[in-house]
């Protein structure tokens, strides 16, 4: 089994820490620029844009897709809605 295949299988439904940081920062920027939150923010302990973006990501409500390009040229699209969080 090739190393690319092992990587694809182990990260299929997970995000790297870099992908998570990029998604949260992009969504926090959208919220800071006036976008409406996709969740009810009244029950959150903190009401800043980063906390809201993190919670939206954890709940799986963000309509974002991550595009991964592998060294062999294969492209994989990972929907944030289908990602598992521990």
UniProtKB/Swiss-Prot annotation:
GO terms for cellular component: cytoplasm; DNA-directed RNA polymerase complex. GO terms for biological process: transcription by RNA polymerase I; transcription by RNA polymerase II; tRNA transcription by RNA polymerase III. One of its GO terms (molecular function) is DNA binding. It is an enzyme of class 2 (transferase). Keywords: Cytoplasm, DNA-directed RNA polymerase, Nucleotidyltransferase, Transcription, Transferase. Pfam families: RNA_pol_Rpb6 (PF01192). The keyword Cell membrane does not apply. SMART domains: RNA_pol_Rpb6. Its EC number is 2.7.7.6. It is found in: Cytoplasm. Disulfide bonds: none annotated. It catalyses: RNA(n) + a ribonucleoside 5'-triphosphate = RNA(n+1) + diphosphate. Belongs to the archaeal Rpo6/eukaryotic RPB6 RNA polymerase subunit family. DNA-dependent RNA polymerase (RNAP) catalyzes the transcription of DNA into RNA using the four ribonucleoside triphosphates as substrates. Part of the RNA polymerase complex. This is DNA-directed RNA polymerase subunit Rpo6. It comes from Sulfurisphaera tokodaii (strain DSM 16993 / JCM 10545 / NBRC 100140 / 7).
